[in-house]
C-alpha cells in the first residue's frame, strides 16, 4: 500500500486515523514531553487532511478527532483530579475545533482561514466557561523557543495564531494548494511579526539576575484535601526548604499556590516558620496562602515575606477559575 496524496484523498478512514495521529503529535509537544516541533508538524498534517475533503460532516470529524487526542494528552493530569470533568472538557473543546474546521473550509483561502478559525476556537476556550480553561495550549508548547516572543506583542492569542499560521504555511508549500506568491506573502508576514516581536519587544533584558529557589514539597499524588490535613503540605515544603543553605546566596525562595491554609496568616504558626527560614537564608519568601475572609469566604493570595518579618507585597487573586 502506497501512502500517497491520492490514497488519502480516496480513503476517509485514512484521513480520520491520521487526524488522530496529528493531534497526538501536538499533544506530545506539550509538557511533560515538550517536543515542541511536533506542534507545528501535527497542525500542518491536520490542515493538509482538511484540504482533502469538502464534506461538512467529515470536516467536523477531522477537527474533533484532532482536538480530542491533542487535549486528552495535554490535559491527562485532570483524570486524577476529576475524571468526569476531564472527559467533558476534552469533548466540549473538541467540538469547537470541529466547528472551526467546517467554517474555515467555506471562507476564502484555507491557508488564511484555517489558522484564524482554529485560533478563534482557542479564544473561546481561553474565555469560557468560568473564565476559560487555557490548558494544553500551543503557546505552552513553544514557550522554550524564540517563537514565543510573539506573546510580548499579542499575548497567547497572537502566539496561537502564529503557530497555526506557520503550520498552514508548510501545508500550503508542500501541498501546492497555494500559489508560490501566496506562500511567499504569508512567509513575509510571519517573518515581520517575528522580527518585530524579537527586536521591538516591550520586554527588555536588564542585564541583572536573581538567584531563586523554587520549592516543590512532593509527597503522594492524587491525594484529595478531604483525605489530608492542611499542615501536611506545609511540613513537606518546610522539609525541602531546610535543605537550602545560606551559602546558596539566594535572593528569593518561591513556594507554590495554596501551600499554606490558615485563618489569619500574620497570626499563624506558619508565618513564624516562614520568617525563621527567611532569616536563616537571608532571602525573601514568596508563598501562596489560602486565608479566611469572613463567614464562608476565603481568598487566595501570594505574599512576599522579608527576613525581618515584614510582608512587603501581597496579591489577591481577583477571579477564581477552574484549575487556577
Where are each of the predicted segments found?
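Soluble catalytic regions of membrane-associated enzymes that act on cell-envelope
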Residues: 198-323
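Membrane-embedded alpha-helical bundles of multi-pass enzymes
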Residues: 2-200
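Generic, ordered loop/turn and secondary-structure boundary motif
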Residues: 36-41, 136-139, 152-154, 261-264, ...
Amino acid at each position: 500500500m502506497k501512502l500517497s496524496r491520492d490514497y488519502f484523498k480516496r480513503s476517509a478512514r485514512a484521513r480520520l486515523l491520521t487526524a488522530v495521529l496529528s493531534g497526538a503529535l501536538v499533544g506530545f509537544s506539550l509538557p511533560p514531553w515538550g517536543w515542541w516541533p511536533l506542534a507545528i508538524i501535527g497542525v500542518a498534517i491536520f490542515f493538509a487532511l482538511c484540504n482533502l475533503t469538502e464534506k461538512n460532516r467529515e470536516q467536523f470529524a477531522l477537527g474533533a478527532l484532532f482536538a480530542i487526542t491533542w487535549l486528552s494528552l495535554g490535559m491527562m493530569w485532570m483524570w486524577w483530579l476529576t475524571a468526569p470533568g476531564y472527559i467533558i472538557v476534552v469533548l466540549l473543546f473538541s467540538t469547537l475545533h470541529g466547528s472551526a474546521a467546517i467554517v474555515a473550509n467555506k471562507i476564502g483561502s484555507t491557508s488564511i482561514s484555517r489558522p484564524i478559525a482554529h485560533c478563534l476556537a482557542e479564544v473561546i476556550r481561553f474565555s469560557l466557561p468560568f473564565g476559560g480553561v487555557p490548558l494544553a495550549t500551543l503557546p505552552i508548547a513553544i514557550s522554550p523557543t524564540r517563537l514565543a516572543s510573539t506573546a510580548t506583542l499579542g499575548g497567547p492569542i497572537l502566539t496561537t495564531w502564529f503557530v497555526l499560521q506557520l503550520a498552514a504555511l508548510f501545508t500550503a508549500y508542500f501541498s501546492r494548494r497555494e500559489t508560490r506568491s501566496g506562500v511567499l506573502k504569508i512567509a513575509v508576514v510571519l517573518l515581520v511579526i517575528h522580527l518585530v516581536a524579537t527586536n521591538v519587544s516591550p520586554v527588555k533584558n536588564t542585564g541583572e539576575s536573581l538567584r531563586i529557589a523554587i520549592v516543590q514539597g512532593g509527597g503522594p499524588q492524587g491525594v484529595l484535601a478531604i483525605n489530608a490535613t492542611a499542615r501536611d503540605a506545609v511540613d513537606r515544603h518546610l522539609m525541602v526548604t531546610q535543605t537550602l543553605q545560606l551559602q546558596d546566596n539566594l535572593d528569593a525562595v518561591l513556594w507554590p499556590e495554596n501551600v499554606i491554609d490558615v485563618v489569619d496568616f500574620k497570626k499563624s504558626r506558619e508565618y513564624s516558620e516562614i520568617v525563621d527560614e527567611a532569616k536563616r537564608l537571608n532571602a525573601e519568601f514568596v508563598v501562596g496562602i489560602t486565608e479566611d475572609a469572613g463567614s464562608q469566604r476565603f481568598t487566595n493570595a501570594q505574599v512576599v515575606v522579608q527576613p525581618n518579618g515584614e510582608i512587603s507585597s501581597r496579591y489577591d487573586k481577583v477571579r477564581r477559575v477552574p484549575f487556577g
